[in-house]
């Protein structure tokens, strides 16, 4: 029955009931996490810029493929494999996120982060040099694997190299670098797509970053060992290998189902249903394996089940997934709207994102600075959720004739709302977690962000394709389904050019209506954020209390 003892009970046992050596190792680990920042001045400036820049690359790689897909199709002539370009990256990110956070809690953060950067760069090099689309897909998967570890590593390095008071500010800065990469992705991709060097340099450009950043990581980034005094053999033996395999299998089949359903295969096809069934079965087996600690221990499970017993972490998880829905959907569909309705190029459509992303980034930075200063976090979720709801509803009302100025205004409202709490959960979770749980807590929130964004985009894309296809075929009944889907995906623009002006306007109205329908997802996410914010405590998390407790917070649910 000892395996059912809670973490709190374990911590309250007398020393005689626990290994003295284990207690000493945990104390050392906690001291490592709580230590003051050891690097300052110009060295710290160079290190933090290098770390945050890797987030730019990660976010750039998320959006850069969208605008070079037509050129990739023309190179390899395999339209049926087009969805794999995004699915491979997303599958690798989602499936390995929790695993990376667990590894970061065992191994040296500096060297593990460096390994992930190299992995990401190797994947990018594979994509750039790919002789076949299968190699390109493999490179995307490898880049996603390294990118997931890189992102968890950034959050871990920021948490262990900053004080608790300044941590929200630096985590807020990840929003700035994420925004820069998100905006640059379509612009850089579109620029290379129409240039003489070609789309392959959209991936090769990442290698220049590695040439500059890796020496900085090697010689200036402080080393951080989360488990000093523990042999690497013991650390590796404590990883949950069975849970890792089950989770990867469940995530891969699940992401494939929601991304391929309605696009490559009908939702009721055997292929789609099989993926859902396999994913469901594997998730059930994974849950049982984690609950009963089969092939692992309670402390070493892949998924941080201990957070499921803490209401605060459950709320933070759902809040993070909800806000990911709020800002990921418009980031992908705003450029699409302008490409269809204003005949924008890929570069121009990417620039149209600036009002949205700039205000998301500004709100993220403001959140990091003010939350560090005043300590309260609940108002950010409540006010941010309200503004996100207003902005999402306004985006839902967009018609073919809606002015560009109005659309920019809607985007600004949505950007401010989403940015107010987009990254806040990382700092809040790290503040609420025990020091040695910080890497796992970081991965827990990162998993929510990736899962929310992945599921939202998959559903939004399916809704758009189905609604747009049905609307276009109602206007042009003679067009084949394959021709319509090819035109919607961007693989062929000749379809729209052959239409009469009146018919083209009706088709664009159908496309605009289909795009407006995807904003039901951000509306739902924002409404969920408001509902959950009401149940969040009115507490100060980042300001030291008079009693000198570690967090300086009141218990969950306290209203003072």
From Swiss-Prot:
Summary of the knockout phenotype: Does not affect the production of the naphthoquinones derived pigments.
Database matches in InterPro entries: MFS (IPR011701), MFS_dom (IPR020846), MFS_trans_sf (IPR036259)
Bilayer topology annotation: Multi-pass membrane protein
SUPFAM superfamilies hit by this protein: MFS general substrate transporter
Top-level taxon: Eukaryota
Record flagged with keyword Chaperone: no
UniProt keyword annotations, A-Z: Glycoprotein, Membrane, Transmembrane, Transmembrane helix, Transport
UniProt protein name: MFS-type transporter pgmG
One term under GO cellular component: plasma membrane
PANTHER family attached to this UniProt entry: MAJOR FACILITATOR SUPERFAMILY, MAJOR FACILITATOR SUPERFAMILY (MFS) PROFILE DOMAIN-CONTAINING PROTEIN-RELATED
Bilayer-crossing regions: 45-65, 84-104, 111-131, 141-161, 174-194, 201-221, 242-262, 275-295, 313-333, 346-366, 378-398, 409-429, 440-460, 515-535
Subcellular location: Membrane
């Amino acid at each position: 029955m000892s395996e059912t003892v809670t973490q709190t009970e374990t911590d309250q046992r007398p020393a005689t009931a626990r290994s003295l050596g284990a207690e000493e190792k945990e104390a050392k680990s906690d001291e490592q996490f709580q230590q003051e920042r050891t690097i300052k001045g110009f060295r710290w400036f160079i290190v933090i810029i290098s770390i945050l820049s890797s987030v730019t690359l990660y976010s750039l790689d998320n959006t850069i493929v969208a605008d070079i897909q037509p050129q990739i199709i023309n190179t390899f002539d395999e339209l049926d494999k087009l969805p794999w370009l995004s699915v491979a990256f997303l599958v690798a990110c989602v499936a390995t996120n929790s695993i990376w956070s667990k590894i970061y809690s065992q191994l040296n953060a500096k060297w593990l982060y460096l390994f992930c950067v190299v992995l990401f760069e190797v994947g990018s090099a594979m994509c750039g040099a790919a002789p076949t689309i299968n190699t390109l897909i493999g490179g995307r998967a490898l880049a996603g694997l390294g990118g997931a570890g890189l992102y968890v590593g950034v959050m871990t390095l920021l948490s262990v190299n900053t004080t608790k008071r300044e941590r929200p500010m630096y985590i807020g800065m990840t929003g700035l670098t994420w925004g820069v990469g998100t905006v640059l992705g379509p612009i850089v991709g579109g620029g290379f797509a129409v240039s003489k060097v070609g789309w392959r340099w959209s991936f090769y450009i990442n290698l220049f970053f590695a040439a500059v950043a890796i020496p900085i990581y090697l010689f200036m980034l402080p080393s951080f060992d989360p488990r000093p005094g523990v042999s690497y053999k013991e650390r590796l033996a404590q990883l949950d290998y069975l849970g890792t395999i089950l989770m990867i299998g469940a995530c891969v089949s699940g992401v494939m189902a929601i991304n391929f359903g309605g696009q490559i295969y009908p939702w009721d096809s055997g292929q789609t249903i099989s993926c859902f069934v396999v994913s469901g079965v594997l998730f059930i087996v994974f849950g049982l394996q984690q609950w009963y600690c089969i092939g692992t221990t309670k402390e070493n499970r892949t998924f941080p089940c201990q957070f499921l017993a803490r209401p605060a972490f459950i709320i933070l998880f759902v809040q993070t997934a909800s806000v990911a829905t709020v800002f990921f959907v418009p980031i992908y569909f705003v450029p699409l709207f302008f490409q269809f309705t204003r005949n924008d190029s890929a570069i121009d459509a990417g620039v149209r994102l600036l009002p949205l992303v700039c205000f998301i980034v500004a709100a993220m930075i403001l959140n990091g600075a003010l939350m560090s200063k005043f300590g309260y976090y609940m108002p950010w979720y409540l006010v941010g959720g309200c503004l996100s709801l207003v902005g999402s509803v306004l985006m839902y009302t967009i018609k073919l004739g809606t002015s560009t100025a109005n659309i920019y205004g809607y985007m600004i409202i949505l950007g401010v709302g989403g940015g107010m709490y987009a990254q806040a959960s990382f700092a809040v979770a790290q503040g609420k977690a025990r020091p040695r749980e910080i890497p796992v807590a970081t991965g827990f929130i990162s998993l929510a962000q990736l899962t929310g964004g992945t599921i939202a985009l998959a559903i939004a894309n399916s809704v758009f394709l189905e609604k747009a296809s049905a609307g276009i075929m109602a206007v042009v009944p003679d067009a084949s389904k394959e021709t319509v889907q090819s035109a919607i995906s961007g693989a062929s623009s000749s379809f729209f050019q052959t239409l009469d002006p009146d018919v083209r306007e009706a088709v664009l109205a159908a496309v605009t209506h289909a795009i407006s329908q995807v904003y039901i997802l951000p509306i739902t996410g924002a409404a969920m954020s408001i509902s959950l914010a009401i149940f969040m405590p009115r507490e100060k998390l980042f300001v030291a209390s008079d009693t000198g407790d570690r967090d300086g917070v009141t218990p969950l649910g306290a209203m003072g």
